[in-house]
Amino acid sequence: YKAVQFFFYTQWNALKAYANGKGVRLVGDIPIYVSPDSSDLWTHPELFQTDGEMHLTQVAGCPPDAFAADGQLWGNPLYDWPTHKATGFAWWKRRMQHATSIYDVVRIDHFRGFESYYSIPAGNKTAAGGHWEKGPDRDFIHAMHEALGEGGIIAEDLGYLTPEVKAMLAESGYPGMKIMQFAFDSRESGNYLPHTYPRNSVVYTGTHDNVTTEGWRTNASPEDVAYACRYLRCKPEDLTESMICACLASVSDMAIIPLADWLHLGSEARINTPSTQGANWQWRL
């Protein structure tokens, strides 16, 4: 494994240098949580919610909602935040410093989990028996500013956000995310319509977790397609192009358009379907 890592980082660093030399910046993801079988948990069990024998006591997930009656049971180890705070968030600083050394911009997944997180007793079969716990909130943000400065981070802030989460994001100064596909739910478009975007944001037609925009067009309800066409003043067959243009024309400081959308590819080019196993992360150009 050491040899594989050596070759990987040698090749990756060469690729990054080439891309940067052409004016291309690389954006990478970092999940908020680690895997139960990760080296992170094995080497630092004291930083996670475990008993004295390396067994998890609480795990991560999402509460029940209209889309999942039992919630989502992710099963990741939860952090022992008081211990992290006592160490000045040293482990997190090292983790983020490494990420920013191999990427130019880092997107933190499930950013809201730093304000409060959903905790489920280990061994539960569903997420229904969980509860919310307070996270490190601004203490974590201040530690990241100290270690990294104030730029180079994208906060994945999708979904329901409490006033406390919004306040934490505002204090961080990190741009949040806007998804164009979410704007055209004719039942509830929320703050995803382009005219509502703040400048300090990153807009996507869709992410790796969404169907392609052409796939969205062909699978969305007639009401949603009609809503999008009215808003964008286009014909249904031109929706993908119009949504791309709306992203690029928005006031958001950054727009990210997946390659499959530039090529107008359908659902067969979807990268990932959350909470499923199977043919995920297999699409190739």
PLM features per residue range, with description:
Residues 6-33:
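Conserved, well-ordered alpha-helix/loop/beta-strand core segments that scaffold catalytic motifs
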